[in-house]
Amino acid sequence: VSQDAQNDSSKQIQYIETAVNGGAEAVICLPVDADGTQSLIDAVGEKNLVFVNRPPTNYSELAADNVTYVGSNEDTSGYYQGEYLANYFKQKGQKEVKYLMIQGTLGQVSTTKRSEGVIKALKDNGINPVEASAPVVADYDRPTAQEMIQPLLTSGKEFDCIIANNDAMALGAVEACKDAGVEINFPIVGIDCTADGAKAVQDGDMAMTVFQNPVGQGKGAVIAADNMINGKKLGTGMEDLGALDDSGKDYSDSIFWIPFEPVTKDNVADYM
C-alpha cells in the first residue's frame, strides 16, 4: 500500500499508524520533516521503519534496532561539483573563483550539505572560492531561480561560475542567461541528473550534474525492510547497489549510502 502525505507531517503519522494497525511489519517512509522523525518512529512502535532519501536531522535516532536509513550521502554530491570546478579552473590557471550560488530550501540537510560540500572541495583542491554575491534561495524551484538570478546578470556582477543545489535551479539560471542575452561561457553546475539536466549537459548549457540514484534508493529501502522483517543482517543483498554503510559511527549498521555519480559531457549519454 502506498500513501502520499502531501507534505503534511500529521498525515504521514496517521498513515504509519494505520499501516501498523493493519498488520504491516515494516514501513518505508520519505519523511516530510527531517526534524520531526522521532514522531514517525513513535508511530511505528515495535514494527520496522526504513527512512529513504531524507535522513533524520538527528542521526542518533537511527540507533534503534527497528529503524534504518537508505539514501545518498549529501556530503559527496556538492563535493563532486567542487572537484569538477577546481579541475576546470586549474586548467585555466585560476586559483581564485568568484561564484554565484543558488540554494534550495534553507534548513534542509540537502541544502546545507550540498552548499558546504562544493566549497570544501574547491578549498581542498587549492582554489580560493569567493562569493560574487550573497547566495540566493530558490527553494529547489526552476522559475524562482530564474527570477532570482536575472537581476544579478543584468547588474553587471562579475562571476566565474554558477553553482546550484539541484538541476531545476541550474536550469533556471540557464534560462535567465538566455533571456538576458548572456553567453554561457562559464560553468553552470547542478545536482540530481534529471532528464532536463542531462539534456542540458549534453547540449553544453550545463557543465555537469551529479546523478542521484532513485531506483537504487528504492530497491535498497525494500531490501532493508525485507531484511528487518526476516531478521537478516541489514546489508544483505545491498552489494549489487554499491551501497556502503557509514562505518565511522556506532549506528553504522543502520545507514546505507547509495553512491552519487558525477556526470559530465563525457559520460552523460550513459544517463539518458
Model feature map: region roles:
Residues 13-22, 26-49, 118, 134-200:
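Hydrophobic alpha-helical
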